[in-house]
Every structure is written in C-alpha cells, then in structure tokens.
C-alpha cells in the first residue's frame, strides 16, 4: 500500500524548486531540488510525475500569489486608469522586493517554453478583472498579437530594473518606484489616459 502524500514534503519541494530555479534557471536538476528539500529524488516524482509538472505547478502557484497581492492593492472605488495602473505597479514592485527568490524564479520560468499554454491560460483566467484593468489604457498596438509580447517585455524590464534599484537603495525606494512607474506609464499607455 502506498504511503499518503505529505503536504509538508510537497511544500518543501516547491520551496526548494523556487530557490533552485531562481539560482540556476529551469536547468536546475531534480536531484538538487530533492536534496535541498531533504527528500530522495524518487520522492519528488511521487509528488510531481515529471519536472515539467513541477515547473508548471510552481509557476501557477507563484503567479496566483502575485496576482492576489496585486488585486489586494486595488481601490475598488478608483476609476482613473492611471491610478489603477499605479496601484498595480506598486503592488508588483513591492512583491518583487519582498519576495526576491520567487520573483527571480518566476522571471526565469516565464521565459521557458516548458510552461504550458494551459498553465498560462489558468493564470490569465483566474483574475479576469485585473487583466481587463491592465488593458484599459494600454496603447492599442501593445494589445495586438504582433506586439503584445513586446509590450509585456517592456513592462517586465522596467519592473525588473525598478525592483533591483529599490532593493539596493531602500531609503530612496519610494522615489525609485514612482519614477519607474512614470517611465512605464509613458512607454506603454495612451497619452490621453488619466
């Protein structure tokens, strides 16, 4: 009879995978992940049938925590697109500063072709209101299929730079985050959006 799975072991594996993917990218070995979690490699495969399954489950878990954080920072009464965008930006940057390992892991995993379309769809469909809000004032070209990935990359590059500088200079972090927001806003949003 198979032993029941332990949530503690699964959580330890997810935490070890987060650190491993943050440090080594998705090339991190399952044996290193298992060793870091304090379990045998075979145990890892009792919880995740393949490395890709581990990668996708971790990606989904981190993204959902991030999006919940971003939604929590929204003011339901705020109707101005720029202020909503500012709240989303501030929540995203604050999350990245507070969770450097998860942020680094998610950035590396997001580039992987091993993250399935189904996993990406689950993230997008989990919080449609956030997705809609983000699109309210974005330049139309960045909503097109041809330039959507480019617009996303611009946002993430500016966010990455802002997180890095805010992390290394906590006394000026608020100013850095505000300047980063203005740079992102001018790059990606329609001039008449307020």
Swiss-Prot record:
Outline the extent of the HTH tetR-type domain: 7-66
Concerning InterPro entries, the annotation shows: DNA-bd_HTH_TetR-type_CS (IPR023772), Homeodomain-like_sf (IPR009057), HTH-type_TetR-like_transc_reg (IPR050109), HTH_TetR (IPR001647)
| Taxonomic superkingdom | Bacteria
Transmembrane segments in this chain: where?
none
Protein transport as a keyword of this entry, yes or no, is: no
Description of how the protein assembles with itself and partners: Homodimer. May bind DNA either as a homodimer or as a pair of homodimers. Binds small regulatory RNA sRamA5.
Q: What is the protein name given in its UniProt record?
A: Transcriptional regulator RamR
Organism field: Klebsiella pneumoniae subsp. pneumoniae (strain HS11286)
């Amino acid at each position: 009879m198979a032993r029941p799975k332990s949530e503690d072991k699964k959580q330890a594996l997810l935490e070890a995978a987060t650190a491993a993917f943050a440090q080594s990218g998705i090339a991190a070995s399952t044996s290193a992940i298992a060793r870091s979690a304090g379990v045998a490699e075979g145990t890892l495969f009792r919880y995740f049938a393949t490395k890709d399954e581990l990668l996708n489950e971790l990606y989904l878990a981190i993204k959902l925590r991030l999006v919940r954080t971003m939604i929590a920072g929204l003011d339901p009464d705020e109707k101005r697109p720029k202020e909503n965008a500012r709240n989303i930006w501030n929540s995203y940057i604050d999350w990245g500063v507070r969770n450097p390992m998860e942020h680094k892991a998610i950035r590396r995993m997001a580039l992987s072709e091993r993250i399935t379309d189904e996993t990406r769809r689950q993230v997008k469909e989990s919080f449609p209101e956030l997705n809609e809000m983000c699109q309210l004032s974005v330049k139309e070209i960045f909503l097109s299929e041809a330039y959507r990935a480019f617009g996303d990359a611009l946002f993430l590059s500016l966010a990455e730079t802002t997180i890095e500088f805010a992390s290394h200079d906590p006394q000026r972090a608020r100013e850095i985050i505000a300047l980063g927001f203005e740079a992102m806003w001018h790059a990606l949003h329609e001039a008449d959006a307020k």
